[in-house]
Amino acid sequence: QLIKLWKDYISEGSFQDPTSPYWSFENMKVPDENFWAIGINTLNNRGYKVQCKIIGVFEVENGYWSLISSFSHLDKDSGEIHLDVISAVYAKKINDKYLLISSAEYLKTVFEHHKVGNINYYVHPFHKFKIEEAERMQEFNVKMAKEFGVEPLEFDYFVARNARDLARTWGYEYMNRMYNPTGKGGIARWRNMTIYSGNNSSDYPHELVHLYTYHVVPKEPHLWIGEGIATFFGGKTDY
């Protein structure tokens, strides 16, 4: 039943569909948002075939199940097999029906949690949470609210020590961005009001500015404009 659920989602190719029958929308508006690296919506119309192989299905904590899948393709020119990603998705029975759950949503139930002002922190087990960083982030949150003329935003903040740990909160056991040269990284997801930090810090003003710009003008800005505003108010990321 779980395998069929995942296979049907992959086969249909409807990525980030707000009416998807496969996902739970109980706590996330776009539960499959972080699966952009798989390219769900293009799997069936690429110039090459992508093989999806389920390599593990097992029960985890709090009534959830985990499904691990590899996505790979054959390079026609070199004859080499390329591993694209190894993904982790979760499932849970809700109202007598299994639905897919994002990795981030599942990890909310098992990660260390701290509420600091308007921010819900979810802490990767390899990261040591520092309350002073979180308080500084909340102060910046209040400052940005005044700057943009809105109420302080309430959002989730996943904090990990590096990009490798962070990618696993997105739902990847493997993806090439886990191994970027700096070992750090992060991103703001405005539709789910979530910041993912792989810079070993609970203070990430640059990404918070992105949440505010998206909140005030709810659409994707041009990259240069969005990054320019975030850098102006929140400083550069250095990675």
List PLM regions with ranges.
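Short, aromatic-enriched amphipathic alpha-helices that serve as compact interaction elements
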Residues: 1-14
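Short solvent-exposed beta->alpha transition segments
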Residues: 14-58, 166
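Post-HExxH zinc-binding segment in Zn-dependent metallohydrolases
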Residues: 51, 220-239
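A short, structured loop/turn motif at beta-sheet edges
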Residues: 57-63, 92-94
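A short hydrophobic beta-strand element
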Residues: 60-73
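Extracytoplasmic
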Residues: 62-64, 84-86, 107-109, 116, ...
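Short beta-strand edge/turn micro-motifs at domain boundaries
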Residues: 78-111
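Juxtacatalytic substrate-recognition/specificity segment
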Residues: 111-222
